[in-house]
C-alpha cells in the first residue's frame, strides 16, 4: 500500500483522534444524565466539522511541503473533502437506523450517549482494520474495484426500491438470533449490560442495543468504505476522511433525531450517490471521472 502522507502526519492524526475521544469522554462524564439539547448538539457538530477542515488544511500544507506541488496538494485535499462528505452523507442514514433501534427498545436519552460513545470507538477500530485490508487487496488485486463498484450499484438500487418503506425490527434476523442465543431481561438495570434475574445472569436490553448498533455499523461500513476507495486508493485519505466523519456522529445524532421526519427523501439521494460512485468504479479503467465532479454530485 502506498500513501502520499508523511509519517509525522500519520502520528499527528493518531494524536488528534485520541485527544478527541478523550475530550468527548470527559464531556460525556460531565453531562451525566443530562439530555443533550439541539443547540448543544449543533455547537459540537460545528466543532467536529471545523476540526475536520483544519486537518484538511494541515494535510494540504504537508503535501505541498513534501512534494513542492500545489496542484497535487489541491487534488489530495479535494479527495479528502469528497471522502469526508460521502461518509457524512451515508452517516445520516446510519443515524436514522440508530434512532429506530433506540425507539424500539425505548432507550432513555442519557443511556443513548454511552451507547453512541462505545459505538464510535468500535467503528473507528473496525473501519481502520477494514480500510487497511481493503487498501492491501486493491494494491494486490486491481479487479476488486469492479466488484466494489457492482456492489455499490446494487446497494444503491436496493436502497431506492426500499425508500419510503418503514423497517420492522421484529422481523430482523439478527435480533431474532440474539434473542434465541442470549436470555434478555425485560427491564433496564441502569447502564449495565448484564444483570441477575431469578438467580441467573442475563443480558439487559442495553446489551441488545449495543449488538445491533455494532451490526449496523458493519453493514454501513461495507457501503461507505468502497465508496471512498472510488475517489482515492490512498489508505491515509480513506482512513482519515472516514474517522473524522465518525468523530462527530454522537453530536450529529442528537442534532438530527428531533427532525428525522423531515428527511423523507434522504434514501433517494443516498441511492443516487451510491449508484454514481459504483458506476465510477466500474468505469475507472475506461474513463476517470474528475474528483471535483464527484464532489459536486455528493
Question: For each of these PLM feature ranges, what is it?
Answer:
Residues 1-298:
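Multi-pass alpha-helical transmembrane bundle typical of ion/small-solute transporters
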